[in-house]
């Protein structure tokens, strides 16, 4: 007859794990878990409203991290600290990948599920996300007309205006491009701070030099490809948004008053770093 050894259940007190937090900071204390978990306030009895809220709240948390990384990346780029700039851009790509994956969870909600609570949303819409707008502004997609929907929140409105008054991340990249290739910063007339960046022949000509001489300009080439990675994920994020909305509400108008899917499809045409895409046909 074999001796069967029975495993004792894990006992944290005998294994040295901290269990008394009366005078020490715990995991929940550090992360303010109680506060976070108390912020999901459903306005209906619909089961799927909780999913809808958590989808958007977690997206906002990840967008906060994107902004944290992009602002730091811009500061590093201003100092020409390319290794740290690259590191943070790589992280942004991974965050955008995570945001893309989240759409798969929301797509488990059917049209019938959504109609049970859609009317409780009022005029609230992702179109009004201050952080999403800030991300676009930092990348370089700057449309001052979009400020209007943020006037009711002065703090967000002022931060967006401040961002419009300074150079975007892509402007900083282009400035470095001109400095390396021409020995001087980009001419001011090429940079318009409060409008979307448009394809520019002078900028594209310089990127073409970089892409045709990768060995000589490896750092600029790597930086450019990091931006292409980011825009690739960003485009997929917007595309996933379009398909999820169309799958759930079809071509109804959005809760925020936009044309819904038609508006989102127009946003798919936006290019953040146009020269980096257009030059591929010139190589």
What are these regions (language model features)?
Residues 5-283:
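Surface-exposed peri-terminal alpha-helical interaction modules
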């Amino acid at each position: 007859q074999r001796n069967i050894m029975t495993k004792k259940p894990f006992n944290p007190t005998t294994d040295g794990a901290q269990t008394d937090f009366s005078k020490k900071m715990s995991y929940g204390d550090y992360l303010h878990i109680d506060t976070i978990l108390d912020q999901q306030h459903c306005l209906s009895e619909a089961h799927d409203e909780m999913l809808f809220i958590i989808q958007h709240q977690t997206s906002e948390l990840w967008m906060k991290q994107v902004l944290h990384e992009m602002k730091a990346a811009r500061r590093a780029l201003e100092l020409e600290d390319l290794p740290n700039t690259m590191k943070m851009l790589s992280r942004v790509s991974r965050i955008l990948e995570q945001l893309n994956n989240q759409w798969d969870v929301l797509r488990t909600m059917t049209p019938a599920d959504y109609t049970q609570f859609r009317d409780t949303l009022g005029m609230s819409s992702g179109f009004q996300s201050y952080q999403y707008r800030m991300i676009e502004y930092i990348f370089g997609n700057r449309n001052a007309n979009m400020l209007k929907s943020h006037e009711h929140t002065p703090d967000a409105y002022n931060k967006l205006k401040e961002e419009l008054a300074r150079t975007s991340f892509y402007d900083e990249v282009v400035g470095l491009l001109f400095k390396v290739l021409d020995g001087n910063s980009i001419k001011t007339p090429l940079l318009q701070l409060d409008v979307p960046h448009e394809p520019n022949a002078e900028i594209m000509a310089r990127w073409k030099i970089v892409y045709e001489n990768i060995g000589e300009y490896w750092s600029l080439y790597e930086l450019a490809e990091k931006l292409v990675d980011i825009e690739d994920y960003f485009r997929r994020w917007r595309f996933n948004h379009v398909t999820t909305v169309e799958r759930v509400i079809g071509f109804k108008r959005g809760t925020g008053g936009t044309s819904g899917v038609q508006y989102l499809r127009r946003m798919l045409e936006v290019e953040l770093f146009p020269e980096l895409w257009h030059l591929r046909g010139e190589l």
